[in-house]
Regions:
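N-terminal Rossmann-like FAD-binding beta1-loop-alpha1 element of flavoenzymes
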Residues: 1-21
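Conserved Rossmann-like nucleotide-cofactor binding loop
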Residues: 7, 27, 256
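Glycine-rich FAD pyrophosphate-binding loop
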Residues: 14-37
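Dinucleotide-binding Rossmann-like beta1-alpha1 core, especially the glycine-rich loop
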Residues: 38-117
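Short loop/edge segments at beta-strand edges and connector loops
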Residues: 71-73, 219-223, 239, 400
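Active-site/ligand-binding neighborhood in enzyme catalytic cores
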Residues: 83, 93-94, 100-227, 231, ...
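C-terminal segments that line or cap access tunnels to active or ligand-binding sites in enzymes
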Residues: 246-248, 252-397, 403, 408, ...
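Internal hydrophobic alpha-helix adjacent to the cofactor/substrate pocket in enzyme cavities
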Residues: 414-430
Length: 434
């Protein structure tokens, strides 16, 4: 099992036979990890658990004592044209300049009329936004926000990922939201679960501790994979001199990285891996030594003039993530490569209501990860199918957010691990199963 993020931990958790779980880092969790400094706790931006699968909910809740998990109703806002709107934008236009509201409603009506005439389904993400919500809503939210998130990849983005993650209100909700009847609670993430002690790393650490009591599950940290020999069904690890045989190999490392470790991969597989694209991430952890005006958990910021596209207040979800009277923020930056204009960021946070005064800031830490979002372009579907199909023919299941090269959440990763364990059981000899 390659990678001890949530997918890898879940695979080991559900495994029916002996499993060796290896992780390159010095701790488990993958992107579901936390850092702590001076009484503040920061995740890798917002990691809120949205639980719908009953078995996964039972797994998570079983790791914590009563009172150690909080169920929280989402408080999310959108900052547009100087107004702080409830989420989602398309169902809460009230508060925007009247000309913008009119443009959005007229565009929505025109889009519905086109749909009634049987207009073809769009294939691009921008086309989806314009077709489903109209040109105005697309122009004032979906295009500018996603331009900041996806950068240069937006124009190539398909609509393959939108069905679950973008709320689609009906006409009554859109009209109601435009005249001031707030339409909240829409979307897949209207409620979330989070450790009351602060820090999403409590989840993978609880799983690690539970797995430590299972003789059939071995965890090796600080261990990377050098090479996979698919002919001999063996793997070379950085911490071991000898090749390690495998009956079934489950990998959660980024899909292109796995293929690069397989010298025997055919040209078509290598080409498919080379065609995959991703978005890297840069954000700021901001420790504030005073209360902040914001009462929301996170806010989307489509305004092009502001240097960030999403801001969250950790301590509004779990007060333990900051010292008493303080607040902890995450600020997701639009620019992923250039110098950070911190005064501009802090001024924008004041405008947003996430900060009262820049002088309240105790410290700021800039952080980044290479793999954040996979890009759903025209090559994605066929390339992914080629890769996953070939790998399974070699007794390799590549899964999870980056192993499966998909857009998903933490619960999905836990489900993917459960499914991978079921798959692996078909490759492990019966006498070796627990």
């Amino acid at each position: 099992m390659l990678g001890a993020g949530l997918t890898g931990l879940s695979t080991a958790w559900h495994a029916q036979g002996p499993v060796l779980l290896v992780e390159r880092a010095d701790r488990v969790g993958g992107h579901a990890r936390s850092v702590r400094r001076d009484g503040f706790t920061f995740d890798i931006t917002g990691h809120w658990l949205h639980l719908r699968d009953p078995a996964i909910r039972a797994l998570v809740e079983g790791l914590f004592l009563p009172g150690e998990l909080a169920t929280i109703d989402r408080r999310t806002r959108i900052y547009s044209h100087g107004a702080l709107l409830p989420y989602p934008f398309q169902a809460n236009l009230h508060g925007l300049p009247l000309a913008v509201v009119q443009e959005c409603l007229v565009g929505y009506v025109a889009a519905r009329e086109r749909a009634a005439r049987g207009a073809p389904e769009p294939t691009s993400f921008v086309g989806f936004a314009e077709d489903r919500f109209g040109a105005g809503i697309a122009r004032h939210f979906f295009v500018p926000y996603n331009r900041k998130l996806w950068g240069e990849h937006l124009d190539a983005l398909t609509a393959a990922w939108v069905s679950r993650y973008i709320p689609i209100p009906d006409t009554a909700q859109i009209v109601g939201g435009a005249i001031g009847l707030a339409q909240e609670g829409l979307g897949y993430n209207a409620r979330f679960v989070y450790p009351t002690a602060g820090g999403i790393d409590h989840l993978p650490e609880r799983m690690r501790a539970a797995l430590a009591s299972r003789p059939a599950a071995a965890l090796e940290l600080g261990c990377d994979v050098e090479e996979v020999d698919v002919v001999g069904r063996r793997i070379k690890l950085t911490t071991r001199a000898d090749w390690q045989p495998y009956a079934a190999l489950v990998s959660t490392i980024p899909l292109p990285e796995l293929v690069r470790r397989i010298p025997g991969a055919p040209a078509a597989v290598r080409d498919a891996a080379a065609s995959l694209r991703h978005v890297r991430w840069r954000w700021l952890d901001v420790a504030v030594g005073a209360p902040v005006p914001a009462d929301w958990h996170w806010a989307y910021v489509p305004e092009p003039r502001l240097p960030f596209f999403r801001v969250g207040v950790y301590s509004n979800a779990a007060a333990t993530m900051a010292p008493p009277g303080c607040a902890g923020l995450y600020v997701e930056l639009t620019d992923r490569t250039g110098p950070i204009d911190l005064p501009a960021v802090l001024a924008g946070l004041v405008e947003l209501g996430a900060l009262r005064d820049p002088a309240d800031v105790r410290f700021v830490e800039a952080r980044e990860v290479e793999h954040a979002y996979v890009v759903f372009d025209a090559a994605w579907e066929a390339a992914r199918a080629t890769l996953l199909g070939w790998l399974e023919g070699q007794a390799i299941r590549s899964c999870g957010r980056y192993g499966g090269w998909v857009y998903n959440g933490m619960e999905d990763c836990l489900i993917a691990g459960r499914d991978a364990a079921t798959w692996a059981s078909g490759h492990v000899p019966k006498e070796a199963r627990a």
